[in-house]
Structures are given as C-alpha cells and as structure tokens.
Amino acid sequence: MNTELLGVIGIFILTIVLAIPLGKYIAKVYLGDKTLLDPIFNPIEKFIFKISGINSAEEMNWKQHLKALLSINIVWFFLCFFVLLFQGSLPLNPDNNPSMTADLAFNTAISFLVNCNLQHYSGESGVSYLSQIVLMFLQFVSAGIGMAAAAMIFTAMKERTTEKLGNFYNYFIKSCTRILLPLSAIAAVALVFSGTPMTFEGKDAITTLQGDHVEVSRGPAAAFIAIKHIGTNGGGFFGANSAHPLENPTYFTNGVELWAQMIIPFAMIFALGFYLNKRKLANIIFGVMTVGFLLLVVPTVMSEINGNPAITKMGIAQTTGAMEGKEVRFGPAISGFWSIATTVISTGSVNSMHDSSMPVSGAMQLLSMMVNAFYGGCGVGILNYYIFIILAVFISGLMVGRTPEFLGKKIEAREVKIAAFIAILHPLLILAGTALASYFTAHDTAMGYWFNGNATGWLNNPGNHGFSEMLYEYTSSAANNGSGFEGLGDNNPFWNITTGIVLLLSRFIPIIGPLAIAGLLAGKKYIPESAGTLKTDTSIFGIMTFAVIAIIAALSFFPALALGPLAEYFTLK
C-alpha cells in the first residue's frame, strides 16, 4: 500500500476518533450542561442576548423556531447583497476591485447565506476585503443556523410529549461561540503557521526566479479558510480554492482542511447519541453513512490512481495516476478522497479541478450530492437523514403490518407526506434545471438579457461532458454544495438567477420539512416500547434505511448519469 493511501486512511480514522469526544461536548452544549469553556463564553453570550433584547430562556414551539430562523436570514441577505453591490465604493478595497452586477450579487449573497458558496466569481478580483469579511460572517451564521435546527430536532426526539423545543437563539449563539469559533481558531492558527496569509494589505509585487514581475494576491485568508471548512461552507478566498498554494500550501494543511470539513458532520451524529442517550442508534446511523461514503470513495480513488485509459492506449506510462487538474504536492489518491468528502459533506471546496476528474470520479461526485444523505453539512446532514428515517419507518411498518413508530411516536399520513415531498423536491430541482439549460443548449437559443450570445456559448466542452457540467451546476446548487465543473461559463444572468432560486428552495424547504415533522411528532402522545415496536437501532433497520436512500435518492438520477459521466466513461474504453 502506498503512502498516499495510508495518508487518506489515517486522516479518516483520526477524524472519527476525534469526532466522538467532540460529539459528547456538543451534546453537553445543547443540553445546557457544564463545560470547560463556560467561564469564557457565558459572559459573551449574556452580553449578546442583553444588547439584542432576547430572552434565551424562553421556550419556543417549532413554528416559532422557523419564524426566527427565516426572519434573521432575510436580514442577512439584504445586508450582504448591498455590500456586494456597492463594494467598489466601500472601505477595505486596496486592490480596487469593482462592485458586482445585480445578478452576481444576488447569487453570491444567497449562496453564502445558504451555506453553499457557489462562487461565480474569482476571489482575487471579484470581492473586496470588506466583502470577504461579510461573507466570512455568513459562513459562521449559516453553519450555526443548520446546527441550531439540528438541536431542535434533537430536543423533539428526546422529549416525550411537548410543544416547547428549546430556544432557537440560544442554540444558534451557542453553536457559533462554543463550537464553530474554537474549532475555527485552531484551524486558522495551523494554517497561519504553515504559510497561509493573514493580512489586510493589498497585492504584493515580487520578481520570480526567471525575472518576471508579478503581483500576488493576499488578504485575511487564514480566518476565512478555517471557517469555510469548519462550517462546511467551501467558498475559496482565492479563485482556485484549496488548490491554491496560499490557501492550502502543504500536505499538512491539506490534512488539516480535510479534518476541518469532516469533524462537525461526524460529531453531530455522535452528539445525537449522547443527547438522546441512545448511542446504538447513533452508531447505526454513522455506520450506514460510512458504508455509503466508502462505496463512493473507493471507485473514485482507484479511478484516479489508475490514470486515464485514453493516455494508456497511447503507450504513455502513468506511474503517478491521473494528474490532470491535480496538484503535485497532493497527488491523485488524496485528491480523489477530498472530492468525495467535499461532495458528501456539502463543503464544496476543492483541492483539484473536478472538471478534470476521470468520468467514474465525476459520476461519484455527482451521486454524492444527488443522494445528499451521507454525513451532510453542519446540522443539515442530520436533517436530511431524518427524512429518510421517517420514510424507512413508514415503509417498514407497511411491510410487517405494524403501526409505524419512531422513538415512541406514531408516524402518520401528515408526516409521511412532508417527508415524501422533501425527498422528491431534491431530484425535481436538479433535473428540471438541467432540462431547461439542456433545452436552450440543444436549440442554440439566443438568450438576450440572460446570456451574451447563444446558449451553446456557456459550454466549453461539447457532448456528454458538456451535459455533465450543466447537471453538476444544478446538483451542486440543490445540494448546497458549491463545487463545480468549471468548464461552464456561469457568471451571467441565466445561471446566476436560476441557480440562486434553486439555492433558496433547496436550503429552506428541507429545513422547514424536518422541523415541522419533529414538531408534530413531539406534540403526540408517547407510546412505550413493546414487543411489537419496530426497533430503529438495529443493523436490519440500517439496511432498510440505506435501501430507501438508494431507491429514492440514487435511482432517480440514473438516466441523467447515463447521459453524462457514464456515457463519457464508455467512450474512453
């Protein structure tokens, strides 16, 4: 086994080992138990609640949680939108970067608001330092929103019969101060000491070894990059994201950034077990997610290590694997692992160019986002999986002739309808958007305001790969991921507006649905467990849930995958 694979395995195992105590700590934070950080953060949180006039001890029902969540996001959207729209005239712009167009500002504000960071611009020339700071703020709060929603779900599952499910603002502030901030500080310090810039000075002029005079972009990158991964956001400070030598300088920083994006999604699963005092249930959920993750990782890593068969046919040896679009300091194995970690977890950061990945890798990256149920982003990963638990419980109950129950609450028609709607919405948004873009491209439609030229102009690659680029853009948007096949010309009104709409719908409806289900179930009468109760903490139920995910989430996309990356794969044979 080569050292590259050992590095991949080592990082994965280390993250799991560290996620267990972090999960215990997260459960304590949401339960209100004492932690080591109380003396530091108690005064800060009291000050925040005092100046904002919020009573953090006031209990809310699920509708009040949603009202608070949605209203605060509206405020943040307009704040970010106007900063981006007028950044050229605002302070902290030493490189004199211009203001964004309205459609790009709309897309960017929504993208960071919903924890996606789709980025139809390049960081070096597209945003000022003030805009970067505002976007970094959104990276914190968008992750905090997802974690607060998960905390409400935890409370709903724990309580026997109640309408009150904690306080949204309490969960949100604690998520930001006690979890995201300390972890981000650790990651940022590691990055700074490894060579990532942390300054408010503008571009630096240098002379290369061959005598060329060039300008190198810098800025407060380390802080931005830390929360981009800890909060599973993924937006790059620089255009090349974590493939950029200043954003991810060494193999060590690559490991830190991989750990950073995986640690909270892993820990949230274990936190569920500690919070409910049901460790076995959490282990089953983690096991199902890990099996799904490995089924996506192994083909990807092997495909990248084995290289491009078209190049092999030319008699050219590929001892280092498929290196197109890869960074030499990382190599194909860990680049392939990162590409699945970042798409499964919904981070969306890249340390290689996904557009240059082998077709099998591209298919696995797409499938990771299409399934959207293994690990997932900060908090929302649990919400997505919760939907499939409800569906699996309902289907299992029908199969054995028992009333569907989950944690002592009956699953009835209303909850199943909500869960089914959420499960169907994801493929609908992806396939409808891709169909629209494909129609315009196939007819070479003159787009007018929507695009400067005919629709084929936004594709740099024809045929199967061009279709994959359009499919990937909408899949990434719907999964709130943010990575892309960057051969697509996406900075224009058509892509900025359509993906912006998909981003909004695919973020907030899948949060509203699980919160509604959890709130409805929490208000129902608790039914004690009996011999006839379907146990949800067994491997059999885990397999059932995996089957539901495979049938509903994965098979819905097979025709689209067959037209794109799978067809491309067979053309290389």
Curated annotation (Swiss-Prot):
Top-level division of the source organism's lineage: Bacteria
ATP-binding is among the record's keywords: no
Cellular compartment(s): Cell inner membrane
Keyword annotations from UniProtKB, A to Z: Cell inner membrane, Cell membrane, Ion transport, Membrane, Potassium, Potassium transport, Transmembrane, Transmembrane helix, Transport
GO cellular component, one term: plasma membrane
Protein's membrane topology: Multi-pass membrane protein
One GO MF term attached to the UniProt entry: potassium ion binding
Broad class of the protein's primary localization: membrane
InterPro entries, sorted: KdpA (IPR004623)
Record-annotated membrane-spanning stretches: 3-23, 68-88, 133-153, 179-199, 256-276, 281-301, 380-400, 418-438, 501-521, 540-560
Quaternary context: The system is composed of three essential subunits: KdpA, KdpB and KdpC.
Family: Belongs to the KdpA family.
Physiological role: Part of the high-affinity ATP-driven potassium transport (or Kdp) system, which catalyzes the hydrolysis of ATP coupled with the electrogenic transport of potassium into the cytoplasm. This subunit binds the periplasmic potassium ions and delivers the ions to the membrane domain of KdpB through an intramembrane tunnel.
Protein's name according to its UniProt entry: Potassium-transporting ATPase potassium-binding subunit
Record lineage: Bacteria, Pseudomonadati, Bacteroidota, Flavobacteriia, Flavobacteriales
Gene: kdpA
